[in-house]
């Protein structure tokens, strides 16, 4: 999926759209997406000016956005239909290494379970095949607005 396609499945826009491309997607099972980290992103003006580091919460948000695309594609819906996937839980988060401008985050998400409208995902973010962040995320569909 190109960035134009990604924008059809996420309501986020600059500066908070954190998925640049989807490389793989298996409906109801998994997604692999990319986030290209650039020095021009606004968080780097304050985190930290002398040694810019992508905040861990932004990495988790990028993973959460990947879960949203997977869920929307799996349910054949889009935000334009008046629905949104909301992050409702974060478990087992680990940060292994810093992410700096110039890095390319590979975001890998697998569905663990879907129970009573709650999706649970196993997620990891890597740079150059090294695990940066791992987590279990949960999201659910809500009416936007």
Curated annotation (Swiss-Prot):
<dbReference type="InterPro" id="IPR013114">
    <property type="entry name" value="FabA_FabZ"/>
</dbReference>
<keyword id="KW-0963">Cytoplasm</keyword>
<keyword id="KW-0441">Lipid A biosynthesis</keyword>
<dbReference type="GO" id="GO:0005737">
    <property type="term" value="C:cytoplasm"/>
</dbReference>
<feature type="active site">
    <location>
        <position position="47"/>
    </location>
</feature>
<protein>
    <recommendedName>
        <fullName>3-hydroxyacyl-[acyl-carrier-protein] dehydratase FabZ</fullName>
        <ecNumber>4.2.1.59</ecNumber>
    </recommendedName>
</protein>
<dbReference type="GO" id="GO:0019171">
    <property type="term" value="F:(3R)-hydroxyacyl-[acyl-carrier-protein] dehydratase activity"/>
</dbReference>
<dbReference type="InterPro" id="IPR010084">
    <property type="entry name" value="FabZ"/>
</dbReference>
<keyword id="KW-0444">Lipid biosynthesis</keyword>
<comment type="similarity">
    <text>Belongs to the thioester dehydratase family. FabZ subfamily.</text>
</comment>
<comment type="function">
    <text>Involved in unsaturated fatty acids biosynthesis. Catalyzes the dehydration of short chain beta-hydroxyacyl-ACPs and long chain saturated and unsaturated beta-hydroxyacyl-ACPs.</text>
</comment>
<dbReference type="InterPro" id="IPR029069">
    <property type="entry name" value="HotDog_dom_sf"/>
</dbReference>
<dbReference type="GO" id="GO:0006633">
    <property type="term" value="P:fatty acid biosynthetic process"/>
</dbReference>
<keyword id="KW-0456">Lyase</keyword>
<dbReference type="Pfam" id="PF07977">
    <property type="entry name" value="FabA"/>
</dbReference>
<dbReference type="GO" id="GO:0016020">
    <property type="term" value="C:membrane"/>
</dbReference>
<dbReference type="GO" id="GO:0009245">
    <property type="term" value="P:lipid A biosynthetic process"/>
</dbReference>
<keyword id="KW-0443">Lipid metabolism</keyword>
